[in-house]
């Protein structure tokens, strides 16, 4: 099914890392440009390289109901990359194990199927004890904003989350694949878009305000 709804809730809890209780208590970086991430080859990349650009940072998966979002993001990237928009893609396997491949396999899939040309980085965790420091910091800047109640997948997502953790709405945890953080040219996290947010109708206008 679209979101592998038949998966066991315990499996979901195990791989999602619902609670942030075990995450690093303090993320000392005060700017997004203080962070270093790993590219697909495991090499360090300083986010200071992206100073002055508008960024979308997104956790992704290749076997998810939201995977076609890649096409929407690529369309947005082609439209605005010459205006200094960058989309930084971080595959994550925490949500139902829907990003099972290696970084190179994921890249090959995305370029072949969706023509992706924006930067893709190494796989990360975004919740729990092993959460990447960048995503710990992003969640502290912008918490959960709620799903689009009109989206057809929202009832499925809320059902899964309710079973996994009745208090999921109260935490800043990333809830699913394709959660997007919008960063302005000064490095401020200005918006968080849940996976149900339409890229063309909701994300693109917010991006264009910053370009």
Where are these regions (language model features)?
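Non-catalytic, surface beta->alpha helical segment in thiol-disulfide oxidoreductase systems
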Residues: 191-211
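Conserved helix-turn-beta segment immediately C-terminal to the redox Cys motif
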Residues: 53-54, 62-63, 67-90, 111-114
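N-terminal "domain-start" segment that seeds a small globular fold
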Residues: 15, 24-48
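Short loop/turn microsegments at loop-to-beta-strand junctions
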Residues: 32-33, 55, 177-179
């Amino acid at each position: 099914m679209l979101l592998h709804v038949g998966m066991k809730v315990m499996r979901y809890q195990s791989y999602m890392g619902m609670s942030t209780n075990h995450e690093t208590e303090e993320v000392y970086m005060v700017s997004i440009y203080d962070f270093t991430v790993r590219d697909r080859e495991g090499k360090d990349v300083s986010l200071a390289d992206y100073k002055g650009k508008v960024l979308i940072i997104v956790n992704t998966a290749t076997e998810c109901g939201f995977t076609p979002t890649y096409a929407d993001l690529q369309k947005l990237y082609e439209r605005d990359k010459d205006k200094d928009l960058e989309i930084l893609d971080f595959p994550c396997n925490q949500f139902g194990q829907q990003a099972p491949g290696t970084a190179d396999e994921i890249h090959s899939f995305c370029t072949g199927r969706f023509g992706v040309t924006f930067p893709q980085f190494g796989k990360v965790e975004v919740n729990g004890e092993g959460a990447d420091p960048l995503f710990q910091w992003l969640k502290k800047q912008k918490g959960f904003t709620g799903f689009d109640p009109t989206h057809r997948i929202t009832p499925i997502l809320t059902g899964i989350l309710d079973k996994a953790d009745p208090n999921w709405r109260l935490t800043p945890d990333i809830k699913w694949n394709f959660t997007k953080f919008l960063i302005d040219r000064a490095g401020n996290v200005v918006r968080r878009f849940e996976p149900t947010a339409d890229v063309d109708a909701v994300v693109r206008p917010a991006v264009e305000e910053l370009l």
